[in-house]
Amino acid sequence: MLKMSVTPMMEQYLKIKEKYKDAILFFRLGDFYEMFYEDAEIAAKELEIALTGRDAGTEERAPMAGVPYHAADFYIDKLVKKGYKVAICEQLEDPSKAKGLVKRDVVRIYTPGTIINPESMDEKSNNYLVSVYREKDNYGICAVDVTTGELYATEIKNCKNGKRIYDEIAKYSPSEIISNEEFLKNNKYIKVFKNNNCAVNAYKPLNYEASSELIEKQFDKKVEELELEDKKFVIHSLGALLSYLKELQKTSLKHINKLTLYQDNSYMGLDSNAIRNLEILESNRNKSKKGSLLGVLDRTVTPMGGRLLKKWLEEPLIDKDEIEKRLDAVEELFNNYRERIELKELLNKVYDLERLASKIVYQSVTPKDFISIKLSLQNLPKIKNILSKFSSRLLKEIYEKLDVLQDVYELIDKSIKDDPSNQLKEGNIIKDGYNEMVDKLRKASTEGKNWIANLEADEREKTGIKNLRIGYNKVFGYYIEVTKSNIPQVPDRYIRKQTLANAERYVTPELKEIEETILGAEEKLIELEYELFNEIREKVELQIVRIQNTAKYIAIIDVLISFAEVAETNKYVKPIVDYEDRIVIKEGRHPVVETISDEGFVANDIDIGPENPIMIITGPNMAGKSTYMRQVALIVLMAQVGCFVPASYARIGIVDKIFTRVGASDDIFAGQSTFMVEMSEVANILHSATSKSLIILDEVGRGTSTYDGMSIAQAVIEYIHEKIKAKTLFATHYHELTKLEGKLRGVRNFNVSVEEREDDIIFLHKIVPGGSDRSYGIQVSKLAGLPYSIIERAKEILEALERDKAVKNELEEAVSQFAFTQIDIFSSAKDALIEEIANCDPDNMTPLQALTYLYKLKEKAASLRSGVI
């Protein structure tokens, strides 16, 4: 920056700015945060505020832009959301008491993953900062929400599948990612995160020893106690995360006190494709909660409950006992309507305890925040009392562990006014009776104001000036104001202080004496209230872990009540869950479609198990194949989340992962062909699925030529059948694949029934056994509104193609048999030829018959070799 002579204040600014070159520096000057030079120019443009100048002791004025300190959060959030880092430089001493230049320094730095203002974010969404450490094909991944204190960590070793790492990070929808350089090199997924408004920055990790020391200090436990002794890559990732936060937050991180360590198989596996294709968190159409599974299930009334519900949907359980604990709790709440309603009404009065707790640690909590905490805690004894009536394991456990925080409630209740000022330096915070000195100073201040009122009345009477008034401002203090028309009546004892356009302001010795008494008391009172408030904050801060635990249990109750309420409203049933390799659903419905459909939803069954793990589903477009497959996946997911399901009966064999290849993809593979994207996704499924997985495949192979696509589709089915043995729903337009039912033991055909009426069709949306041999493409096109002339021309072309059915059938048979020759075990033509040779009886043939038979066999063998039967 500038090297020439500058003013002392500007010199101070430049020294601080030198340390934070990559941040926009908010420099506190009185009641404003000022920005200078390039920062000012950026701020003026991005915040749409005036760009002015300030004398800096140089020839040219320094460009300057500023925002009021009391509105700073709004402007900080705006800059951070645009990707800027913002450093807050505060005055570290009272300017009125400073000797010389006021001391200033940076007290906090904000980035997208470290903003702490709850008003700037969706209350039912987390704001995650993710730290990634990579060493060859080994990864340590940590995610933290600094506004709630939640911290998660996992380690993935020997992973060459970049998509798997992407999915693990993407499930947090991070606002910011920090990582070592090795992770950033040649990583095509980094662009995807950046395109989704996620800041991605390199951060040099600490060495192993320094990371371990930082972790142990943060959690006050040894690495072994945290079960990290064999988690080298997590230690590097977590060490970097904590180091980064301490650099930025410059305060204690007491609210980050629990590390949740998990493996990537701790929950049902849901990759980003499954979450998107099943529209679990948001609708693909409008990118909002409405139209998603979350939108249907979310009846939560607390911010904590809303956030927990999202997490549960992203991480369905795979432990039968844990699932049943949730289901039993939902059932008990479902059956006890009155208690459920009472609980919900009480929960509705609970504020965001998690984020309020974080504000206490960050010293950004306000007096009104404490009242929000008090009002929340006030309801806890009533909540606990209702919980005492329940007997299900989970609700009983919550009842036993729920801390009503009576001591915290009593402290706030006796110390903080019921309607306090929200500004710490304005007083009116501490309740009467809490502190003797506060009471004395407040009385002096109040009596002083009474003296002012009495003095005003006396002066009006003595002078005869009826509109005389006594006022106050911060510059001149107390004054007597007289309008110009009444100046002749002003007595000599009045001392002129200020001239206005229509009035004069005066003081008197008596007024100055009262002023000193009042202002002295008020100043001392404000300082004392501020000190006491900080003492109260520190006392409550010691109970942060207890507050967080209570918030966690409140969130669980909220989600369980939400599940019970939705189950009642939408007529869901309690599913049976077990470890059997079977899924049975009777009269299943799509949980989202049934709520938005104007027509009655057609329910469908499924019974899929070891003897029939693969369903090939045929039928026309728009008939409901995709809806059916998605509803099966969603019902399984809901059951494993611990929610009742839309069906008349459901028995769910727990699945370890759900995979989907449905419809268009997102921009992960931007620049690649549709077919390449499809094949990449299918390959990922085939590499990752197990016999306990549920696979949903829709129109695999459609992105290439008919024969290529059909061959690929069949090969995929064969591979799943022989190698993976996963439960699979496979929708296709390749009717030739229905012949696999007779070739592969575990394949069964189903189709979506339609009713034909002359040239029209009616979709019955019913899944029935058997394959379909027609696509009804022309009829569907007619329903879709294609012009009449095109429909008629399409009919003519179709009739021409169907005229020589013998040729058509021969071609189809040839293609089909060609496909079956690819794997010996499925070569029915070859098997038939071998069977024919084995069964022939040459002893009973004449020489001519034997020769004729031999030529016939030779012709069949030649046809087999050429691939045409």
UniProtKB/Swiss-Prot annotation:
Q: Which GO terms describe its biological process?
A: mismatch repair
Residues noted as binding ATP in the record, renumbered to the chain: 619-626
Alphabetic keyword roster: ATP-binding, DNA damage, DNA repair, DNA-binding, Nucleotide-binding
Record InterPro entries: DNA_mismatch_repair_MutS, DNA_mismatch_repair_MutS-lik_N, DNA_mismatch_repair_MutS/MSH, DNA_mismatch_repair_MutS_C, DNA_mismatch_repair_MutS_clamp, DNA_mismatch_repair_MutS_core, DNA_mismatch_repair_MutS_N, DNA_mismatch_repair_MutS_sf
* Any single Gene Ontology cellular-component annotation: cytosol
A Pfam family of this chain: MutS_I
CDD domains listed in its UniProt record: ABC_MutS1
> Which N-terminal residues, if any, form the signal peptide?
none
**SUPFAM superfamilies in alphabetical order:** DNA repair protein MutS, domain I (SSF55271), DNA repair protein MutS, domain II (SSF53150), DNA repair protein MutS, domain III (SSF48334), P-loop containing nucleoside triphosphate hydrolases (SSF52540)
Q: What NCBIfam families does this protein map onto?
A: mutS1 (TIGR01070), PRK05399.1 (NF003810)
- Which protein family is it in? Belongs to the DNA mismatch repair MutS family.
Tell me the function of this protein: This protein is involved in the repair of mismatches in DNA. It is possible that it carries out the mismatch recognition step. This protein has a weak ATPase activity.
PANTHER family, A to Z: DNA MISMATCH REPAIR PROTEIN MSH1, MITOCHONDRIAL (PTHR11361:SF34), DNA MISMATCH REPAIR PROTEIN MUTS FAMILY MEMBER (PTHR11361)
Which protein are we looking at? Answer: DNA mismatch repair protein MutS
| Species name | Caldanaerobacter subterraneus subsp. tengcongensis (strain DSM 15242 / JCM 11007 / NBRC 100824 / MB4)
Lineage start: Bacteria, Bacillati, Bacillota, Clostridia, Thermoanaerobacterales
Gene name, per UniProt, is mutS
